[in-house]
Amino acid sequence: MAGIFEDDKSVVRDMEKKTPIVVPVLVIGFNRPDILRQCIAKLRESKPQNMYFACDGARADKEGEDAVIREVRSVMENDIDWPCEKHYRYNERNKGCEVTESEAISWVLSENEYIIVVEDDIIAPYSFLKFAQEMLYLYKDAENVYMISSNNQTPMPLPNNEDYCFSNYGHIWAVSYTHLRAH
């Protein structure tokens, strides 16, 4: 008996194809080179085409932190071994997490309409990057969508077995749009 598909092998091949991640991915790191390596190793599986990196400067009162920061920056510059655009923003002095992240996001959004933000301790699988990219495109003109986040604070399933939902609560790890930075 013939299968549903004339050529089952072509269906499998199509399922194995990955949608390229073309939305810029911003990786924000600080003083955890080993954790950053894990983050980049996971991103390597997705091979985003446009990578941005930001790193704060060492704190003056933390002896030896400048060497750790140099190592983090080396990881950012040398562990990306797939073809992609690479952009770097490094603070010469420490500005703190809030300022560094805000400035880095503004920097990327000054050059791009969309952004996916990944902090160094986020291990973002391809499924999240693809989801984020698809949602950015889908909701780009929705004025009631301020951010897209991979977050689940409740163990209960979503109604109707939905894959995602709208919430009145934001979560800081997310993606965003240029036009919303003004709000």
Q: Predicted regions: what is each one?
A:
Residues 129-161:
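Conserved donor NDP-sugar-binding/catalytic core segment of glycosyltransferases
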Residues 113-123:
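Short beta-strand-to-loop acidic/aromatic patch adjacent to the donor-nucleotide binding site
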Residues 46-87:
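Acidic donor-binding segment of Leloir-type glycosyltransferases
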Residues 178-183:
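Conserved small/polar residues in nucleotide/adenosyl-binding loops
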Residues 92-100:
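A short, glycine-/small-residue-rich helix N-cap motif at loop->alpha-helix starts
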Residues 2-41:
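N-proximal low-complexity "stem/linker" segments adjacent to membrane-targeting elements
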Residues 171-175:
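Short glycine- and hydrophobic/aromatic-rich loop-to-beta-strand nucleating segment
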Residues 102-114:
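Active-site nucleotide-sugar/metal-binding loop of Leloir-type enzymes
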